[in-house]
Structures are given as structure tokens and as C-alpha cells.
Amino acid sequence: MRHRKAGRKFGRRTNPRKNLFRNLAVSLILHERMTTTLAKAKTIQPIVERLVTLAREDTDHHRRLAWAQLGDQRAVAKLFDVIAPRFVGQPGGYTRIYRIGQRRGDGAPLALIEFVA
């Protein structure tokens, strides 16, 4: 039985799942909004929120931690130079999720995730 097993697996093993989360986080940071399934949006939201909280204090150590999580220098630069300064005085809640209907092919619930402000 799978009782009390937290987390979504998305039909992937560990490394492909981590790569999925990394790619979704990089896409959200670079484009500042994206459309994906509701489950993926809910999963990526706390990851991105933690990265923004980390980036609010711009130090070499925090940049290296963000680089280890994202693996994309453009995303790290945009996170620290563009996105994080907007949220310096805000204690959290940097992203929001809107439900936008269902996907035509399989009926999966879709969502728009974007940065606030």
C-alpha cells in the first residue's frame, strides 16, 4: 500500500524526475510565466519560492547554491539580478497558480504559474 507516501512521481524514476523539476524551474525563471499541468505547477511552486528566497541575499555562496539547483547560468543571473530584487521586502508568496481548463488530448487539468508583480 502507498499510504502516507508524500510527493508526486510523474511516472519517472528519480533522476529524470529531478531533471523535469530543474527544467520547469529554469523555464519559469527565464519566461516568468508558463503553462503546464496543475500537478507540475503545484510541485514546482515551492522549489521556485525557495530559490527566490535564497536569491534575495546576493552572495557568492547563494549563487553557487542556485547554480547547483538550476544548472543554467542565464537563469541564475536573471533570478538574482531581475526577479529577486522585486521581492526584497516580501516574506513569501512570490508565485501564483491559475487553473486554465483542461488539455484537449487527455483532459489533464492545466494551470498557469507566474511570478506576482
Curated annotation (Swiss-Prot):
Record's keyword annotation contains Ribonucleoprotein: yes
Transmembrane segments: none
Keywords associated with the record: Ribonucleoprotein, Ribosomal protein
Disulfide partners: none
Molecular-function annotations in GO: structural constituent of ribosome
One of the record's GO cellular component terms: cytosolic large ribosomal subunit
Gene Ontology BP, a term: translation
Keyword Ribosomal protein attached: yes
NCBIfam families with a match to the protein in the record: L17
Protein family membership: Belongs to the bacterial ribosomal protein bL17 family.
Subunit structure: Part of the 50S ribosomal subunit. Contacts protein L32.
Name under which the protein is recorded: Large ribosomal subunit protein bL17
